[in-house]
């Protein structure tokens, strides 16, 4: 048994959502079982490399921990932002939709992902997702306090650190124009 997770995709699903270059320069994580044989792992790796993927082999636990931060937590946040928008009266919802900027559009794109798949991910990886939510909540509380204190210096420090992480993601090749993941 040799599970693979191509870390590529969009909020769209089904046969019509396919893109020929979807896996190009994207990571595929292979999490072989303890009984997997090396020649079989190499075959699976070669398959993904042929599709244009970069391949990384890791344990299922390492995969789940990393993805709880890089993928699952952003979905939690996106669903909660949408829920917050929907908590307003209809007129305000319409105004929010009409004047939505890139930030909200990006979050709603993520929140438009396939519900059944995300239900299953949230249930199957619940412990690590809850751990990520706890860390996020702690950081959000700290940010809330900085905002309440009107601590401009601390806000700039937080924003600059965030900017540096973004630069690191770009430098690592994890933000490219191709394939287009619905960001345009």
Predicted regions, residues:
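Long, positively charged, glycine-interspersed low-complexity recognition regions
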Residues: 164-184
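Short alpha-helical linear motifs
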Residues: 91, 156-158, 179-184
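Alpha-helix N-cap/loop-to-helix initiation residues
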Residues: 11, 36-37, 129
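Internal alpha-helical scaffold of NAD(P)-dependent oxidoreductase catalytic cores
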Residues: 21-106
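Interdomain hinge/lid region at the active-site interface
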Residues: 93-162
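Rossmann-like NAD(P)(H) cofactor-binding subdomain of soluble oxidoreductases
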Residues: 1-16
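Short, flexible, solvent-exposed loop/turn segments with mixed acidic/basic and small polar residues
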Residues: 16-22, 119-120
């Amino acid at each position: 048994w040799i599970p693979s997770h191509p870390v590529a995709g969009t909020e769209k699903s089904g046969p019509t959502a396919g893109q020929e270059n979807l896996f190009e320069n994207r990571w595929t994580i292979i999490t072989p079982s303890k009984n997997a044989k090396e020649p079989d792992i190499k075959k699976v790796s070669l398959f993904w490399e042929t599709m244009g993927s970069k391949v990384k082999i890791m344990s299922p636990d390492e995969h789940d921990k990393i993805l709880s931060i890089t993928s699952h937590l952003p979905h939690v946040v996106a669903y909660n932002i949408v829920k917050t928008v929907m908590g307003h009266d209809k007129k305000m919802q319409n105004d929010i939709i009409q004047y939505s900027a890139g930030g909200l559009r990006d979050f709603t794109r993520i929140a438009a992902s396939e519900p059944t798949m995300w239900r299953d991910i949230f249930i199957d990886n619940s412990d690590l997702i809850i751990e990520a939510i706890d860390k996020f909540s702690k950081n959000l509380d700290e940010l809330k306090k900085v905002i309440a204190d009107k601590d401009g210096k601390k806000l700039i420090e937080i924003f600059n650190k965030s900017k540096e992480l973004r630069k690191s993601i770009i430098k690592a090749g994890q933000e490219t124009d191709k394939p287009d993941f619905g960001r345009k």
